[in-house]
Regions:
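...with weaker cross-activation on analogous glycine-rich loops/strands in unrelated enzymes
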Residues: 56, 64-67, 99, 104-179
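Active-site nucleophile-His-acid catalytic modules used for acyl/amide transfer and hydrolysis
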Residues: 73-91
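Bacterial N-terminal signal peptides that target proteins for export
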Residues: 2-14
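Short linear capping/connector segments at secondary-structure termini
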Residues: 48-52, 81-86, 115-120
Length: 179
């Protein structure tokens, strides 16, 4: 066999092997299981360290699991419509992010758009989780931390925990039953 044929055969084999790995990597990435345990802090308020939310020890297990699972999203990009068809995607928008949180609190079976979340659960603020929704945007406050996809500066868009609040003017406050 000539060197050029051998080289071409090996390059083609390597290329096919590499391409065969791509779907497997994508499937693993989009279907990865978020954690069901994580860091805690004493008391009733969550805290934020290096972008990771620490669940309050006094919170119900559903709230802790929701916080730990949502930490899984913290470096995902903002993608308009992300999380509407599935809880596990490459990027999330505001309603996909809040839907993910509520799913992991065992309070939501399917993703909901921001307008739908204006009628979610019970009216008013919750003890542990409050969803602030309006047509076009939604965010949540969980044990004192804000979960939102809109940041204050460049590169801050996407699912993130934040220490600072935001105006709830024009939003409807809702909460998961029991939380």
């Amino acid at each position: 066999m000539k060197f050029s044929n051998l080289f071409s055969t090996r390059v083609a084999s390597l290329a096919f092997a590499f391409l065969a790995l791509i779907p497997a990597a994508e499937a693993h990435y989009t279907s990865a299981t978020p954690p069901t345990s994580g860091p805690t802090v004493p008391g009733n308020k969550a805290c934020l360290k290096d972008g990771v939310a620490y669940a309050p020890e006094n919170a119900p297990e559903e709230v802790k699991r929701a916080i730990w699972a949502t930490n899984f999203l913290r470096n995902k990009p903002y993608v308009w419509g992300g999380g509407h068809d599935s809880f596990y995607v490459d990027g999330y928008d505001c309603s996909g992010t809040v839907s993910f949180l509520l799913k992991h609190a065992n309070r939501l079976d399917h993703p909901m758009a921001s307008k739908e979340l204006t009628n979610y659960g019970g009216s008013g603020k919750g003890r542990w989780i409050t969803v602030y929704a309006k047509d076009g945007h939604v965010f949540a406050v969980v044990a004192g931390l804000r979960l939102d996809t809109s940041g204050m500066g460049f590169g801050e868009d996407g699912p993130r925990w934040r220490l600072t609040g935001r105006s709830a003017w024009g939003f409807t406050a809702r909460h998961p039953e029991g939380l």
